[in-house]
UniProtKB/Swiss-Prot annotation:
<dbReference type="InterPro" id="IPR006689">
    <property type="entry name" value="Small_GTPase_ARF/SAR"/>
</dbReference>
<dbReference type="GO" id="GO:0005886">
    <property type="term" value="C:plasma membrane"/>
</dbReference>
<dbReference type="GO" id="GO:0005525">
    <property type="term" value="F:GTP binding"/>
</dbReference>
<dbReference type="InterPro" id="IPR005225">
    <property type="entry name" value="Small_GTP-bd"/>
</dbReference>
<dbReference type="InterPro" id="IPR024156">
    <property type="entry name" value="Small_GTPase_ARF"/>
</dbReference>
<comment type="function">
    <text>GTP-binding protein that may be involved in protein trafficking. May modulate vesicle budding and uncoating within the Golgi apparatus.</text>
</comment>
<dbReference type="GO" id="GO:0003924">
    <property type="term" value="F:GTPase activity"/>
</dbReference>
<keyword id="KW-0333">Golgi apparatus</keyword>
<protein>
    <recommendedName>
        <fullName>ADP-ribosylation factor F</fullName>
    </recommendedName>
</protein>
<dbReference type="GO" id="GO:0005794">
    <property type="term" value="C:Golgi apparatus"/>
</dbReference>
<keyword id="KW-0547">Nucleotide-binding</keyword>
<dbReference type="GO" id="GO:0005737">
    <property type="term" value="C:cytoplasm"/>
</dbReference>
<dbReference type="InterPro" id="IPR027417">
    <property type="entry name" value="P-loop_NTPase"/>
</dbReference>
<feature type="binding site">
    <location>
        <begin position="34"/>
        <end position="40"/>
    </location>
    <ligand>
        <name>GTP</name>
    </ligand>
</feature>
<feature type="binding site">
    <location>
        <begin position="136"/>
        <end position="139"/>
    </location>
    <ligand>
        <name>GTP</name>
    </ligand>
</feature>
<keyword id="KW-0653">Protein transport</keyword>
<dbReference type="GO" id="GO:0016192">
    <property type="term" value="P:vesicle-mediated transport"/>
</dbReference>
């Protein structure tokens, strides 16, 4: 109930400001397992710097202006006990961003299941929502390649969903803008 209130208030102000600027509004839900780098990525995009973060308990909301978009980005914590709450925030989502720690191969089955859950839960409500997967931590030792991640997560089976895997390093900023360029080209915002 409280999340719906915040959602409505935030959407109202985003819509008002964007009307004056001629930008399309989109709602983004940024999710992923704990420790994947969601908040680091969000704040690198927002402020251009690495901001020291602590594990997100609940959510962070930022409005990011990028090219012709005004993006209302909801960064939701990824701890196991918080993931059940993802469903509370996904109404009217235009783009799902799933951030993956591309060095943590032991959790790829868990990532695959969570992506499957999100898509299954949103068959009707956000069926046109695009899916951007950031393969984060590419600056670390031995990260998985995008092609390997596509195979590991069986993404080619998502035939009714626009999706893209973007390698990135949230700390260095590599690949972040390319991912958001994909969103500009593939989102159906208002």
């Amino acid at each position: 109930m409280l999340s719906e209130f915040f959602n409505n208030i935030t959407s109202f102000f985003v819509n008002i400001f964007s009307l004056f600027e001629g930008k399309r509004n989109i709602r983004i839900l940024m999710i992923g397992l704990d420790g994947a780098g969601k908040s680091t990525l969000l704040y690198k995009l927002k402020f251009g710097d690495v901001i020291r973060t602590i594990p997100t308990i609940g959510f962070n909301v930022e409005i990011i202006e990028y090219k012709n978009l005004s993006m209302n980005v909801w960064d939701i914590g990824g701890q196991n006990n918080i993931r059940a709450l993802w469903r509370q925030y996904d109404q009217r989502t235009d783009v799902f961003i799933f951030v993956v720690d591309s060095t943590d191969r032991e959790r790829f089955d868990e990532v695959k299941q969570e992506i499957k859950n999100i898509i299954e839960q949103n068959k009707n409500e956000s069926s046109n929502a695009s899916l951007l997967i950031f393969a984060n931590k590419q600056d670390m030792l031995n990260p998985i390649t995008p092609a390997e991640l596509v195979n590991s997560l069986d993404l080619n089976s998502l035939t009714n969903k626009k999706w893209h895997v973007q390698p990135c390093s949230a700390v260095r900023g590599d690949g972040i803008y390319e991912g958001f360029d994909w969103i500009v080209s593939n989102s159906s915002g208002k």
